Amino acid sequence: MNANPISQTSVSVNIQQVMKRYETREGQEILALDRTDINVNPGEFIAVVGPSGCGKSTLLSLVAGLAKVSAGRIAIDGEEIRRAHPKTGVVFQSDLLLYWRTVLDNILLPIEIKKRDRAAFVPKAEQLLEAVGLKGFGAKYPAELSGGMRQRVAICRALIQTPGLLLMDEPFGALDALTREQMIMDLQSLWLSVKNTVIFITHGIEEAVFLADRVLVMSPRPGRIDLDLTIDLPRPRTWEMHRDPKFIEYMQTVRRIFEAKGVLHQ
C-alpha cells in the first residue's frame, strides 16, 4: 500500500462491565463475556487475542451494534451504542463481496444502501483502491481476484464512509501464510496514513504484537480481559522486528498468560 493521507476522525470506545449471555435451544444459558472493561483512545490500534470460543467475536459484534449487551455499557465518543453506529466500519474473516458486482460497485455498496450520492464517492473509492495497491481494478469482479486482493477490497468498502472506528474480526485468518504476512504489512501502512481507531480480533500472538499499540489478552470462556499490554515499539515496524528482544519478550508475556490458563502447553 502506498502512503495516502486520507482524512479520518478517530473515536474513543468505552466498554464498562459488559456481559453477554446466550440461551441454547435446550434452554441452557451460556455466559460468553463476563464483566469486561476496555477503554480505547482515539487513534489507537488495539489487538484482542484469545483462544477459540473466548468471546472475541462476540465482543466485536457488541461494539459494532450487531448484538445487544446483557449487562453493562458500550459507548463510542460518549454515546451509548443501541444499534449499528454510523462512525463504524467492519471487516470480517470472509470478504463477503457480492460476486455479481464489480470491485468498485462492492466498495460503493454502503453508500447506495444509505441512499447517498454515489457519484460523489467514486473518487474516494478509486483513491482507496490506489492506497491498497489495486489501482485500475475497479471494473474487475471478485472471481478475478486472489483472496488477499478481495480482502483489500473489503477493507476499502469498510473505509468508504470514513469510519472513525474500524472493527476487524480475524480478517487474515483464511489467507495463506505469505499473503497474510503481506496483508499485515499493508494494513500497518494504511493505518499509519489514516490513523483511525482500530479494534483487531486475532488468534495470532505474533500478529497482535506486531500491529498493535496495546494487546488485550482474553481468558477462555467466559471471556474477560486477563492482560492489557502496551506495545512500546517504534513505527513503522519492519518484519525484522520479529527478532528484536523486546518483541520476543512481549510475545512471551502473552504466551505465559495462555500457559497459566492451560490454553498453551510446553
Summary of predicted features, one role per range:
Residues E112, A119-F137, S189:
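Conserved ABC ATPase "signature" region
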Residues G72-A84:
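Conserved ABC transporter NBD signature motif
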Residues V49-P51:
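The feature captures the beta-strand-to-loop junction immediately N-terminal to the Walker
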Residues R101-L108:
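Short coil-to-helix segment of the ABC ATPase nucleotide-binding domain corresponding to the Q-loop/switch region
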Residues Q8-S12, R21-R35:
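A short, flexible loop at the N-terminus of ABC-type nucleotide-binding domains that lies
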Residues L166-D169:
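Catalytic Walker B motif of ABC-type/P-loop ATPase nucleotide-binding domains
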Residues K140-A143, Q161:
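Conserved signature/switch motifs of ABC ATPase nucleotide-binding domains
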